[in-house]
Amino acid sequence: LQKRVWITWETQRRSIELSRKFGCEFFIIEHKGVMRYPISVFETLSILKKTKPDILFVQNPSMILAALACICKYILKYILLVDRHTTFLLDKDYKNIPWVLFFQFLSRLTIRHADITIVTNSLLADMVKRLKGNPFILPDIIPTFVETERVELKGRRNILMVSSFGIDEPVQEVLIAMKDFSQDEVCLYVTGNYNKLDERVRSTAPSNVVFTGFLDEQDYINMLFSCDAIMVLTTASACMLCGCYEAVSARKPLITSDKDVLREYFTDAVFVDNTAPGISASIKKILDNIDNYRERIESLKGKLITQWEEQYKQLEKRLSDVNS
């Protein structure tokens, strides 16, 4: 049996789930502060020396981890798969910004020297091909959640907005859209650390918006099951949103941004242009047809689970071909 190892420098559900599926020995190396990189490099080298993998999976980010794995591959002679989560600034032309140019250099290096670069969508796969890499599309596994209790929510209809208050999230437009609804009619619950949101923007939220703050895992899962629909938005063009997979898992009608990569995968969602009028209209649309959208998402869940298993089998075959 071949020895499989998965190393990541940050905790993400995707790496945990995929490492389990691929039968890998799993290592999380997480450090903060100025010594983060030298300590992480040392621990990674120690793991590689101890485990002597035949097949190594690494998560990118971290770019440094992926680059290190590419270098060590030629010494330790393992097959390398890099699970790449973002474009890492390769989709834009940045000039005269030294740290960006350095990261772009590492990005190209890791794409060309990895045996397989795993990506979540066709847009990223095309980018990897253009840079002479070997891509394979494998979205996230639809997670399995267990509800432990129903959360009492205050609206007649309740929407959960899955948020991290990132710069790619049109939170202000959502707050404006919610002014079209009364508190009795529709209530919006927004997850995530709201301290990241500008206080001036937060103060404009109407009374039918509740900021939950960061929720622990089980409380978050219970919220997924307790709401009527889930909203997950981004302005980014190549981002597959974790909250979309979670909405499908909980069989909840989904409102998400009108991006090609999201349309391609989450076919039965309601897609929105990230404007306040568009968001308001999408909420009305989904709540006026809630049973229909619930059935469509339930059907989509079964389809995506079957589709993912087929993609997984194809990747195992690709891995076998590389190995031979």
Segments (PLM) and residue ranges:
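Membrane-proximal helix-turn-helix segments that form the acceptor-binding/catalytic region
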Residues: 42-45, 71-75, 88, 98-117, ...
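Donor nucleotide-sugar binding/catalytic pocket of nucleotide-sugar-dependent glycosyltransferases
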Residues: 108-148
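Conserved donor-binding/catalytic core segment of Leloir-type glycosyltransferases
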Residues: 149-169, 175-179, 189
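Nucleotide-activated donor-binding/catalytic signature segment of Leloir-type glycosyltransferases, i.e.
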Residues: 198-218
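Acidic donor-binding loop of glycosyltransferase active sites
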Residues: 225-239
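Short hydrophobic beta-strand element within catalytic cores of glycosyltransferases
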Residues: 229, 252-256
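Conserved acidic donor-binding segment of nucleotide-sugar-dependent glycosyltransferases
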Residues: 269-277, 284-291
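A charged, aromatic-enriched C-terminal amphipathic alpha-helix characteristic of glycosyltransferases
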Residues: 291-323
